[in-house]
Amino acid sequence: MGREQYNKIINNTKNTLDKSILEKITEFKYKELDGYYVIEVYIKSNVKAKEMGEIITNIEEYSKECGFNILVDFLRG
């Protein structure tokens, strides 16, 4: 997966997630680790498990539509 596909996935996430959830995300980063595509989602400390579930579902479902299997990693920051 290249930068263009990553940007497409993140833009979809920003356009489809509820604004109240997006406000709790500080940053997205992309890396490849041991052959896996990983999107790191940096979140504020007040994110609830349900909101994290919505983020991961949004990213994974759209990624699969684009033909990629993505791992989502949540980090505080």
Give names to the regions the model predicted:
Residues 51-64:
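An amphipathic, aromatic/His-enriched active-site/gating alpha helix that lines ligand/cofactor pockets
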Residues 16:
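Ligand-binding pocket scaffold of soluble enzyme catalytic domains
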Residues 29, 37-54:
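A short interface-forming secondary-structure element
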Residues 1-8:
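N-terminal presequence-like segments and adjacent domain-start helices
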Residues 1, 25-30, 70-71:
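Short low-complexity stretches enriched in small and charged residues
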Residues 19-39:
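Short edge beta-strands and adjacent turn/loop segments
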Residues 63-77:
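A short amphipathic beta-strand at an alpha->beta junction
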